[in-house]
């Protein structure tokens, strides 16, 4: 059937609630337009593809089961075509009136040709049906509609009148393979079978279609419509909140939600795990409703993170908020949304855990060890702290995540570690606090890390600097010193790049003078306290002393 016949038949189409919102983007629009431009130039018949419909009102209204992205795009394209023809006052020999094109594809005597999914309807009606020029999007799919209209309008405005007419006719003559079915269960099942066509669906979109289909299968006949409406309402709310997500996308949040609420917790891997838990539910309709309700609440609650003003949340963001932390935050927001002090305690706990995990950097699976704590967490941060502490130090974790492993990592080689600067700034803050200052008041140009005992302990003439821990039998550091002391926290210092360059390989007395003259960083000024008995030397004894002091600070700062 030609596209022109399909639309002149008087059919009206609607997109059922289990369909995804409009998701095509510039790549798909460009291919759509290029196919029309190239096809009309060589004279081949354009295939519009398959269109799978469900008969809702015989001969009048049809649900689109497969092909809704293409139909929506065709109608947006025709709206742009109508606008360009009118703007340029073109007359086409093949078109008696541009109004005919508008009636066929947009609206005819009160009959709107396409009713999109509820979340897209306000935008589509305003921009396409009523041809408004401005609309403020509240979801990614609405923004896609806005951008599609702008794209086609811009591209068509560049074309000559003859090319426009040829493209229009080529689109109208495109062949569409039409299949019509009756019955919602059959239609929903066909949607499941067609769901891998076209642009790949997100997991959230696939989940929506799966849940909608289950409503048809398991709801009592009298409850089908109301259950579908409730589910559609939840997903409409979810999609309306997508633009408010920060740092993560919809599938990330779905994954973190599953960590928080599914029985397998951090064992969740993909949608098959959701389906498996659904299959095991006695009341499947209620299970879907409960899951979707909680998922909607998670999308609503996570919006609060946009406006969170909390130093530990900021640090979590700096650590790229590990997935396990999001799961606890999702549950925390459920129980403590209106309890800022409790949320502050949760952020503090999660920052400590995230820091320790990042510092240790073990390949051992950490998230699975958090499954029991996330299952039992109902907002009590004190209990959660005890649960996590116990998990980190139980027999299954003691070799990977325990307090002792954390201490060993702090005592080891930290040079080049992504958290080294954070550790030294936190240490600086602890030195400033008794004096009533904060690190926010300090700015260092080209921040760098200084090896107090230099990496190359030679003077400008190439002679060994014996003020450092040189093995005099080889005139350089011993392997033991290099492995245990050179890159440990006791030998590392925050410094500006310019100061670092000026003192790099100087004798220790010159370095100490430079540190003492620095009135900006207390960690530089306190170096003298570690060498009061031997002010001309910086060796393993002094490094150990400073290392132990900083490590003890860290053990207290990140104690769980």
Label the model's feature ranges:
Residues 204-207, 214-426, 529, 533-534:
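A cross-family structural signal marking well-folded subdomains
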Residues 35-41, 45-60, 96, 379-523:
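Betabetaalpha-Me/HNH-type nuclease active-site subdomain
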Residues 63-70, 168-171, 179-186, 317-322, ...:
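Secondary-structure capping and boundary motifs in well-ordered enzyme cores
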Residues 42-43, 84-87, 197-201, 335-341, ...:
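Secondary-structure transition/capping motifs at alpha-helix termini
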Residues 191-193, 203-208, 274, 340-351, ...:
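Composition- and surface-driven signal marking solvent-exposed, interaction-prone regions
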Residues 1-264, 505-559:
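Glycine- and hydrophobic-rich flexible loops that cap the catalytic core of alpha/beta enzyme folds
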Residues 191, 330, 347, 351, ...:
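Generic hydrophobic alpha-helical scaffold/packing signal
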Residues 5-7, 164-171, 304-307, 380, ...:
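Short, conserved catalytic or adaptor-binding loops enriched in Gly and charged residues
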């Amino acid at each position: 059937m030609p596209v022109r016949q399909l639309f002149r038949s008087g059919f009206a189409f609607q997109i059922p609630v289990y369909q995804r919102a409009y998701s095509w983007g510039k790549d798909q629009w460009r291919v759509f337009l290029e196919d029309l431009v190239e096809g009309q130039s060589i004279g081949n018949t354009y295939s519009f593809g398959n269109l799978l419909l469900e008969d809702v009102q015989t001969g009048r209204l049809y649900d689109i089961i497969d092909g809704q992205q293409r139909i929506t795009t065709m109608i947006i394209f025709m709206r742009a075509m109508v606008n360009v023809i009118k703007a340029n006052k073109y007359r086409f020999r093949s078109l008696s009136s541009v109004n005919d094109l508008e009636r066929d594809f947009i609206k005819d005597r009160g009959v709107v040709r396409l009713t999109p999914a509820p979340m897209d309807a306000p935008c589509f009606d305003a921009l396409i049906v009523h041809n408004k020029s401005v609309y403020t999007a509240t979801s990614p799919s609405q923004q896609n509609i806005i951008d599609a209209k702008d794209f086609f309008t811009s591209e068509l405005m560049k074309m000559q009148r003859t090319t426009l007419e040829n493209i229009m006719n080529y689109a109208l003559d495109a062949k569409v393979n039409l299949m019509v079915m009756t019955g919602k269960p059959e239609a929903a099942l066909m949607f499941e079978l067609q769901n891998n066509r076209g642009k790949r669906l997100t997991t959230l979109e696939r989940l929506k279609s799966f849940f909608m289909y289950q409503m048809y299968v398991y709801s009592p006949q009298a409850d089908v419509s109301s259950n579908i409406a409730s589910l559609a309402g939840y997903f409409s709310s979810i999609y309306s909140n997508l633009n408010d997500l920060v740092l993560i996308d919809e599938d990330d949040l779905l994954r973190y939600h599953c960590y928080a609420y599914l029985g397998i917790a951090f064992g969740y891997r993909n949608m098959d795990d959701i389906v498996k838990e659904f299959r095991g539910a006695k009341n499947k309709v209620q299970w879907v409703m409960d899951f979707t309700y909680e998922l909607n609440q998670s999308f609503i609650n996570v919006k609060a993170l946009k406006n969170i003003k909390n130093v530990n949340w900021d640090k979590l963001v700096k650590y790229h908020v590990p997935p396990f932390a999001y799961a606890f935050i999702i549950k925390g927001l459920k129980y403590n949304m209106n309890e800022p002090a409790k949320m502050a305690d949760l952020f503090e706990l999660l920052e400590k855990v995230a820091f320790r995990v990042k510092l240790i950097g073990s390949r051992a699976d950490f998230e699975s060890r958090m499954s029991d704590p996330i299952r039992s967490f109902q907002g009590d941060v004190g209990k959660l702290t005890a649960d996590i502490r116990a998990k980190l130090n139980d027999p299954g974790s003691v070799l990977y995540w325990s307090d002792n492993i954390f201490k060993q990592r702090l005592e080891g080689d930290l040079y080049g570690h992504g958290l080294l600067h954070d550790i030294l700034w936190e240490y600086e803050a602890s030195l400033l606090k008794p004096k009533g200052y904060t690190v926010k008041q300090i700015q260092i140009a080209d921040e760098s890390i200084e090896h107090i005992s230099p990496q190359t302990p030679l003077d400008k003439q190439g002679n060994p600097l014996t003020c450092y821990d040189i093995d005099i039998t080889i005139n350089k550091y011993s392997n033991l010193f290099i492995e245990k002391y050179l890159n440990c926290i006791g030998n590392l210092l925050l410094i500006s790049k310019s100061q670092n360059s000026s003192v790099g390989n100087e004798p220790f007395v010159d370095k100490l003078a430079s540190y003492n003259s620095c009135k900006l960083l207390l960690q530089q000024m306190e170096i003298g306290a570690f060498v009061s008995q031997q002010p001309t030397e910086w060796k393993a004894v002094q490094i150990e002393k400073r290392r132990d002091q900083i490590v003890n600070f860290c053990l207290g700062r990140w104690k769980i």
